[in-house]
Amino acid sequence: SDGLILICPSRTADCRMEMYNADGSQGIMCGNGVRCVGKYVYDHGLVDKDKRTITVETLAGIKTLELEIEDGKAVSVTVDMGEAALTSRLPEDITVDGKEYRFVGINVGNPHAIYYVDQVDCLDLERIGPAFENHERFAPDRVNTEFIHVADRKHLEMRVWERGSGETWACGTGATASVLASILMGYVDDEAEVSLQIGR
């Protein structure tokens, strides 16, 4: 498993999400996870069935979710990720395993380092992922690492190495951070689709 999500009571929102990575460390935010929480609490009657907007307390703040409902079930959940913050120069150079890389640091509730590569399919993430995650530049908290290929101005291909979990099939906050970094770098237009291992 990539980790564990607990749905708990909240005094400030409809519910509170606690998220733990595969290594047992507590995660700050999980974009896809908070969307799953929204679907779960709606579908299981933990919030009023008249609601189309719900709030979830996270360590990254309260997130607002918009629900699309069909036949009494949430079929789509979107989340306002909140404000992002640039956490590096644009771009910043870094040496990992003796090789120079350029990255863009973005925080969307949790830290991400976005690296641009010629192709994502041939990367040996099991070997290089930990070196990026645990690099001294990101100490002591570590970093989620996205490897991005810019297919065109409206399409990114992404693989992700998540801190505490390793390579995962998808990462909502990582996709958000990658699109923002790519816009700031001038690589994509104001909207772009991100292809991951299991979807877009």
Regions found by a protein language model. Name each.
Residues 10, 59, 80-82, 106:
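Structured loops at beta-to-helix junctions and adjacent beta-edge loops in soluble globular domains
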Residues 82-88:
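Ligand-binding beta-strand-loop-alpha-helix segment within the catalytic cores
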Residues 73-81:
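Short, solvent-exposed secondary-structure boundary/capping segments
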Residues 88-92, 125-127:
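Short, charged, solvent-exposed linker or helix-capping segments at domain edges/interfaces
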Residues 1-73, 113-200:
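A glycine-rich beta-to-alpha transition motif near the start of alpha/beta enzyme domains, typified by
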Residues 89-90, 98-102, 132-133, 144:
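Glycine-rich, charged/polar anion/phosphate-binding loops
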Residues 54-56, 91-98, 104-106, 192-194:
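Short acidic-hydrophobic surface loop/beta-edge motif
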Residues 95-122:
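Internal active-site segments that recognize and position negatively charged phosphoryl groups
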